[in-house]
């Protein structure tokens, strides 16, 4: 076969294999025997081996897996992959529906099965698959393109030459999971606890051939750029994705109201065991994109969607002992040490006991048969005692009076249920602060997890976060299981963390009551650490959602000489102390009508998109939020303004129409 013939035949084979693969892996309706598919695949592989230049990015042979990767690159999600708020019962679902209707009126919902796998993003250019990434922290994930390419239900080429970014869930079917664990058991390897862990572990293999051997699957459940493509609803987006050749779960339903949603939830609670894959709940989304825009999002999750989690599985096991741990803020927490037991697909040996009052109220004793469940199917907790099983050998537990780490006296502050160690130099607190500082939500220092921090701390190499920026390769190589390459990578990650925006550093400092959302609000408002350090209590409380308790904690933190010294050291090492997001009041004209104002947009503007309006308001010193409250200063109402306008009228909030809005932003440009 000459090259011209080979080129024609390779194109024919790619078309045939794409069609047969789609019929088998997506439609589950194969039209040819497996042997015929394999024969055609072998023929294409032989042609590509003889003429390597004929190999294309969408060739079915690319699913077999290429050479191992050195490491996974970071990928920034243009549209964040936000997590969802949870619902645990019918009441939570009805509360969600009530909040939606208060904001946008009546709404239809789309219900989908919540696949228990790994959330991924897949990007296509002109119809060709070009990049896949993990969710990561929602803003930044890892490039797993080559591993996703091995999933046969994921199209390498779409049926239309469109550019898009889809979101989906990669998972391991139950049959594949059982087969994989049987193979690992035969080889004497550690078994995977559940299909979710197996899927996540497979997609994070540096060798794509390993991922290819694991028989993963993928359902697509969203389209990040749907509105750019002229699509107006989530249900329409799912139909469009399916028409392009994606595998979209057929077990979905558009519901006219919350009663239909609850019926769908109850139906799948019963039918769940019959599925060939694991699900842990139902995802409910407002169908209309226009209503989704109006509802907006919090810092953590969209207001237009919620994840109903199936009731947690409960099991009984023996409480062997109770361990007391000290957290980064000095809170002392009791942890149950259990006879190993499987709960919701994982082996559990430890569970939270919350606090001393909880142990006393439940009369939990060492040696008891205790009931364990996973809260939200994630955190194991002791929920009760099987008193009938007591034989008299059980031992009541008493919380210690002194810190188990530094032996300082434990105290209970007024109004709190937790015991605290108030020694700021307690080794446990210092260690936990370092772990928090390096965590994904804070400075995101890859490779600096609990084990490495503990080694560094025990070796006397670090005591506070500034010490991290003094570490050398020679010091790291001396640690257990830390080679030269690992040390180089860790130092690079520490160096990269210096460029983080202010909100990450602020959250990483571990100021009491300041979570990730509050850190974001403070960074946006003050823009530099210097301004925040100088802020008075009143200035702090002027920031939306910053209350008196948090303001007191922030001023107390910056009043400490140790905090001043720490920040000086971090500055000296080049750690960024400025907010890197969109600038607001610093660029606003002094007479801007928006300066320092909290603004809500509702309805449709004829002159610009909602995002463009938001940018204009922020340019002129305002802050845009998604819902109307007593802290709202101004509401801008376009056409078809809904319940937000009514609420603003009830609260006596100033309201502008579009013409007044345009007048002000044009004045701000002069």
UniProtKB/Swiss-Prot annotation:
One of its GO terms (cellular component) is cytosol. GO terms for biological process: DNA repair; DNA replication. CDD domains: BRCT_DNA_ligase_like, LIGANc. Keywords: DNA damage, DNA repair, DNA replication, Ligase, Magnesium, Manganese, Metal-binding, NAD, Zinc. Residues 589-670 form the BRCT domain. Its cofactor is Mg(2+); Mn(2+). It is an enzyme of class 6 (ligase). NAD(+) binds at residues 34-38, 83-84, 112, 135, 169, 285, 309. It holds the Pfam family Nlig-Ia. Its EC number is 6.5.1.2. SUPFAM superfamilies: BRCT domain, DNA ligase/mRNA capping enzyme, catalytic domain, Nucleic acid-binding proteins, RuvA domain 2-like. GO terms for molecular function: DNA binding; DNA ligase (NAD+) activity; metal ion binding. The active site is at 114 (n6-amp-lysine intermediate). Transmembrane segments: none annotated. It comes from the Bacteria. Belongs to the NAD-dependent DNA ligase family. LigA subfamily. DNA ligase that catalyzes the formation of phosphodiester linkages between 5'-phosphoryl and 3'-hydroxyl groups in double-stranded DNA using NAD as a coenzyme and as the energy source for the reaction. It is essential for DNA replication and repair of damaged DNA. PANTHER family: CHROMOSOME TRANSMISSION FIDELITY FACTOR 18 (PTHR23389), DNA LIGASE (PTHR23389:SF9). HAMAP family: DNA_ligase_A. This is DNA ligase.
